[in-house]
């Protein structure tokens, strides 16, 4: 089971990587009519994938499929599995020029670091502190015995996490991180197995138990995705064949 937990922990970086990449690539975008047309391709692909998914569900599961269900399934983002990401991305895309204005108006690196600390504290940090049960000694030896935890820091803004990842992506594009690649790789591997061991402990004696710490606003995916993004960014592609690029 431990290997499966390691894999589950590692794969939790999937969505955060896309959000980091969005901030990294779109940090210079400005408000204009041309900008808004940029989402057209994404929406077209989404509609096509929704159509394909609904046809499959109709054939394989007997789900209702007609013009009405297709329109409603597209508009409410239920026709295609994991459509929630497109729903989130539409909002992030619309906000991006304004987020860029806010980020760009900060005068120096220190102010931008304060911005990152603020959004990370509001969205990511709660998943580090609000996950323990201090009311039961038995819980510490058997964490699967109860799902009750004490809140230690505010968590209302956790749903704001896409914007936190976006700003981190903006910062990485502008400043990067001054750390040796080898050190970063060691830190990534160490963090992966540390978090996996923690997740194994939290699930010991039963099937895998998820929690805020491993959700996309959790501290585990945040640390792993930022380190992995920085490592991928340092891969030199100049001498790679075009097919590999």
Segments predicted by a language model, with ranges:
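Alpha-helical transmembrane segments and their immediate juxtamembrane cytosolic regions
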Residues: 1-245
